[in-house]
UniProtKB/Swiss-Prot annotation:
Job of this protein: Transfers the gamma-phosphate of ATP to the 4'-position of a tetraacyldisaccharide 1-phosphate intermediate (termed DS-1-P) to form tetraacyldisaccharide 1,4'-bis-phosphate (lipid IVA).
E.C. designation(s): 2.7.1.130
Upper taxonomic lineage: Bacteria, Pseudomonadati, Pseudomonadota, Gammaproteobacteria, Legionellales
Residues reported to bind ATP: 58-65
Stated name of the protein: Tetraacyldisaccharide 4'-kinase
């Protein structure tokens, strides 16, 4: 079981200070790498449809998956034809790019990809090479906008809009790896189009074995539960359950962990509540104690207004360019 070092989220710490020189070196490398793309010394893949990148500048969960689900479905509801590309973290398929379906194996294409596909109404492709994923998507589907899931640092993929998400831990101690949780200097947020705070709303709790069997949120006030999370920020999940009144026995696992039945061999009969991403990998277990806690992203109205105005203008501009107007 792995989790982010505590000193990443402390303003001052001995270990953070010791690692600061390495963070400075890391920042230099990041700036040089990004600069090479900016001046054209490294190739950027460009496409005839808008590319919207959703990501963050911190290590760990920032609510990207629920947000991408919301964004893809909202685009579809407003008449767009979206598609999603992702790296497919944890997937071990021998062939990429690969189109994700509802029946895809999380072991092959990654847990997040399977969760996304079960909750969005649009095509999705996974590949380590994001540009190859977009090419495959556009070759096989009639998409007019592409969402890049967790691609903020993949500069080789051209983009028209960038959305950075921030979770409840914000930027931690403000330092880059390894002294802090930042993948890029915090000044990077000044270059993105939108910074959106993570906000998740509880949706429902249902049994994995029989999804029709649900637990009312009010029932949690009387329950002691095992909370199991193999996500980037398990603490947020545990706090959500505690806020709903549950007495939580926390079990954090490393991100993208693939569970075995013995991982749930607890010495009692308390219910076991999992995140949606974890539940995707546990449906094969014949265990009536396993329940899934599903959530929805809550997105600010101002962002929605600004984003859809911008994306509509970008689509019109790109159409005009293709038609030579």
């Amino acid at each position: 079981m792995l989790k982010a070092p505590r000193f990443w989220y402390q303003p001052r710490s001995l270990l953070g200070g010791i690692l600061s020189p390495f963070s400075f070196l890391y920042q230099i490398i990041v700036r040089i790498r990004r600069g090479l793309y900016a001046v054209g010394l490294k190739k950027i893949s460009k496409f005839p449809v808008p590319i919207v990148i959703v990501g963050n500048i911190t290590v760990g969960g920032s609510g990207k998956t629920p947000f991408v689900i919301w964004l893809a479905n909202e685009l579809k509801n407003r008449g767009f034809r979206p598609g999603v590309v992702s790296r497919g973290y944890g997937g071990k398929a021998n062939r990429f790019p690969q189109t994700v379906t509802e029946n895809s194996d999380p072991l092959q294409v990654g847990d997040e990809a399977v969760l996304l596909m079960k909750k969005i109404d649009c095509p999705m492709v996974v590949c380590r090479d994001r540009g190859a994923a977009v090419k495959h998507l556009l070759r096989n589907f009639q998409c007019d906008v592409v969402i890049g899931d967790d691609g903020l640092q993949h500069y080789s993929l051209g983009r028209d809009l960038e959305i950075a998400l921030l979770d409840d831990r914000h930027l931690g101690n403000g330092r880059c790896l390894p002294a802090g949780p930042l993948r890029e200097p915090k000044s990077r947020l000044n270059t993105v189009d939108f910074v959106v705070p993570k906000q998740l709303r509880p949706n429902e709790i249902y049994q994995l074995k029989n999804p029709a069997k649900k637990i009312d949120f009010n029932e949690l006030k009387e329950l002691t539960v095992h909370a199991v999370a193999g996500i980037g920020n398990p603490g947020y999940f545990f706090k959500q359950l505690e806020t709903l009144g549950a007495n939580v026995i926390a079990h954090p696992f490393r991100d993208h962990y693939f569970y075995r039945s013995e991982d749930f061999n607890f010495d009692d009969d308390h219910l076991i509540i999992l995140t949606e991403k974890d539940a995707i990998k546990c449906k094969q277990f014949d265990d009536e104690r396993l329940f899934c806690f599903s959530v929805d992203a809550v997105v600010p109205d101002q962002f929605q207004n600004d984003f859809f105005r911008l994306i509509s203008n970008i689509i019109l501009r790109k159409q005009a360019q293709r038609e030579g107007i």
